[in-house]
A protein has these predicted regions:
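Beta-lactam-recognizing serine transpeptidase/beta-lactamase-like catalytic domain environment
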Residues: 69, 75, 283-295, 308, ...
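Solvent-exposed, polar/charged alpha-helical surfaces in well-ordered, non-transmembrane soluble domains
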Residues: 91-99, 201, 205, 209, ...
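Amphipathic, well-packed alpha-helical segments that form the structural scaffold of globular domains
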Residues: 245, 273-276, 284-287, 317-325, ...
Length: 688
């Protein structure tokens, strides 16, 4: 039997239902009737736009994970043209903003290449500015040869700049209007105009507190350099030029993208550059962001580790600077002539560059802080921007003699037991008027009866003239190429290939015949041979390891942005080999050992009492025209278990023996650092 429903319960449920209906109706009334107008106005005045979200660029690290270059975020001010030019007096607003920027100690970007006050004249222009001004003159219907005064007159009229403004204020307004306008001229391919880069909070606050319209704050990344070392290797970034855009646009780059311009930043652009994202940004009537919804998340660039050891790079730069400046400070007739130089150190087993130093160098952190800074560095007489280690080309002098020795031994021209009498003069062609001398002849003595090992120790010209006379020059050139001399090294940065002296090279350079004297001079590292310090270091490493020449790539690994995923690991690549017997290698290596460890050796004074046994070769490259000789020095250590090969070049350094101390200072640091960095590299990378 069913229980009867009590009337009280029915009444209670009915009351509860009625109460809920009343609450819903009241809420609906408030939403649509009371607050409806406000919501309508807010929605009507809200603006949603799709914006690009810049991706962070990848970091650059040394071989042990120490950060060399990373990013720092900054606030930029950009103009909102739709808002700015809806105002009654946009020119007045621009002038107000420019004055506010100056009062806050910030600087703004003015692309107009015209002086700041009359009489107006064009200023010096870079390539981008020239393209920009040509495009604007064409747009304006002005002649390409229009004067700055004619251009300013056009700007005053075109941009409706009131005559009440002073000439200086008119120039400020014209510069900003020009900078904005050129972004909308077809086919100029200019990056987005950023009014103030890395704006201070004082500036942003001042503009907002004064309700200055027409601008927006965006966030971007700038490169932060954690070291003042390796400036020539790291390189720098910048906005694309119109020419660069034609290449990068096929890869999906926007015109406003920042790209690598030089060094590792350029070489490894494909890894370092991230992929921008997009977001829907909603702003209310006052311009305040009320919502951000990512439609595509930005993907940051990858983390690139170089083969360079930061500690060794520091040691290389310090040793080179100290050595050259000491040479300059000496009161000798040649001290004023001492110029720039380079030191390169590579791993014998892999060919990986561990340090690449140049003198003079520069500081990437300050180079682009102002036009004055850049001009001072770029126009300096001693060329600090020139990468001597990779682009400098120098005659190797006697450092080439081990190559001649290997060629002679391998081709059977000599054996390890062959002895050649040094008489001070090579007389074979004396009847033709050509009788080159050994360097020691000026002292009134000779080297005696040398074998190949002793000839390397003594650097006897007569011995190597004899070998060179018996070797076809193209055969000697083939061995030089196998050692990497006059060949690409495999480094990812711009480099000179140099040249080995041959009949074809002389014909190309001078359109004259090849003579026997050319072969003799080529055999001792003179003639037309020119090599880079990096090539000399890799050549020395090839001697040290018994004939295997590796690529000089500076890329070690590529990891994901946070370092959690290994994307690419560079393995040692063999570029060529020098095939000869172990006996031949031992004879040449022993000769280099004696250079540093026998009292008759030219580097004995520097390395005779050194704690690690070193093998070395000094070189003096004659320049002619009464110029002071270049000094060349190569070495590897330890002699019995080679780990590192070093090449040092000092322009007008007089003689190779005089710069051996630079290499010694570097090796002091190398063997100190080596005891510190003994943990496996995989473990060290986890400690970063």
């Amino acid at each position: 039997m069913e229980k009867p429903i009590k009337p009280g319960r029915v009444a209670a449920l009915a009351c509860l239902l009625a109460l809920l209906v009343i609450v819903f109706v009241v809420a609906l009334y408030k939403l649509q009737i009371v607050d409806g107008k406000a919501y309508y106005e807010e929605n009507r005045n809200s603006v949603a736009s799709s914006q690009t979200v810049e991706a962070a660029r990848g970091s650059i690290l040394d071989r042990y994970g120490r950060v060399l270059v990373s990013n720092t975020s900054c606030n930029n001010l950009i103009f909102n043209p739709d808002d700015l030019f809806e105002q009654d007096d946009p020119n007045g607003i621009l002038l107000q903003m420019a004055r506010t920027v100056a009062s806050c100690g910030d600087t703004y970007v003015d692309d107009l290449p015209v002086t700041s006050a009359p009489p107006f004249a064009y200023t010096d222009m870079n390539d981008t500015q020239r393209t920009q001004i040509r495009g604007f003159l064409k747009y304006a219907g002005l002649d390409e040869e229009a004067t700055a005064v004619e251009l300013m007159s056009y700007c005053r009229e075109k941009f409706e700049i009131n005559n009440n403004y002073s000439a200086a204020d008119m120039r400020i307004i014209a510069g900003l209007r020009y900078s904005i306008k050129t972004r909308y001229i077809d086919k100029l391919y200019l990056p987005d105009y950023v009014f103030v880069k890395d704006a201070s909070m004082e500036l942003i606050t001042s503009l907002k507190e004064n309700n200055v319209p027409g601008f927006e704050v965006t966030v971007s990344y700038t490169r932060q350099y954690h070291t003042n070392l390796a400036a020539h290797l790291l390189g720098y970034t910048g906005l694309m030029t119109a020419e660069e855009y034609t290449t990068y646009k096929t890869q999906g780059y926007p015109m406003s993208a920042t790209v690598g311009k030089d060094g590792a930043e350029l070489a490894f652009e494909k890894y370092l550059h991230g992929t921008n994202g997009t977001a829907i940004v909603t702003k209310n009537a006052s311009g305040t962001v009320t919502g951000t919804t990512y439609t595509t998340e930005p993907e940051p660039g990858d983390q690139v580790s170089l083969t360079i050891d930061l500690d060794l790079q520091s040691a290389a730069e310090q040793s080179l600077t100290k050595g050259i400046e000491n040479m300059k400070s000496k009161s000798t007739k040649n001290s004023d002539a001492v110029g720039g130089g380079a030191l390169v150190a590579v791993a014998v087993a892999t060919g990986q560059p561990l340090a690449i130093a140049n003198y003079p160098t520069f500081d990437l952190q300050t180079l682009f802080q102002s036009e004055e800074n850049y001009k001072a560095v770029s126009e300096a007489d001693n060329q600090p921007l020139f990468n001597r280690a990779l682009l400098g080309q120098y005659s190797p002098g006697s450092t080439f003699k081990p190559c001649t020795a290997i060629a002679g031994l391998t081709e059977g021209v000599i054996t390890t037991g062959t002895r050649i009498q040094c008489t001070g003069t090579f007389r074979k062609y004396e009847d033709t008027g050509y009788a080159p001398k050994c360097w020691i002849a000026s002292s009134g003595v000779t080297h005696g009866n040398d074998n190949v090992t002793e000839a390397i120790r003594d650097s006897c010209n007569i011995f190597f003239y004899t070998v060179g006379d018996s070797l076809p020059i193209d055969t000697l050139a083939r061995y030089a190429a196998a050692f990497g001399l006059g060949e690409h090294t495999g480094i990812e940065l711009p480099e000179s290939t140099g040249q080995m002296a041959t009949e074809a090279v002389k014909k190309k350079l001078e359109n004259t015949n090849w003579y026997v004297g050319d072969s003799l001079q080529a055999a001792i590292g003179q003639s037309y041979s020119l090599f880079t310090p990096l090539q000399l270091a890799e050549y020395c490493a090839t001697i040290a390891n018994g004939g295997t020449r590796h690529s000089a790539s500076i890329l070690k690994t590529v990891r994901s942005y946070d370092g959690s995923e290994l994307i690419y690991e560079n393995e040692a690549e063999v570029l060529s080999t020098v095939e000869t017997s172990d006996y031949n290698w031992a004879a040449v290596q022993k000769g280099m050992y004696l250079v540093a460890n026998d009292r008759a050796g030219s580097a004995y004074e520097t390395f005779g009492d050194y704690g690690v046994k070193v093998a070395a070769k000094t070189g003096t490259a004659q320049l002619g025209d009464n110029q002071v000789n270049n000094a060349i020095f190569i070495c590897y250590a330890p002699y019995d278990n080679p780990k590192v090969a070093v090449a040092v070049v000092v322009e007008h350094g007089s003689a190779g023996a005089s710069i051996a101390s630079i290499a010694r200072d570097f090796l002091d640091a190398y063997f100190t650092v080596k005891t510190v960095n003994t943990a496996p590299e995989s473990e060290l990378s986890l400690l970063q």
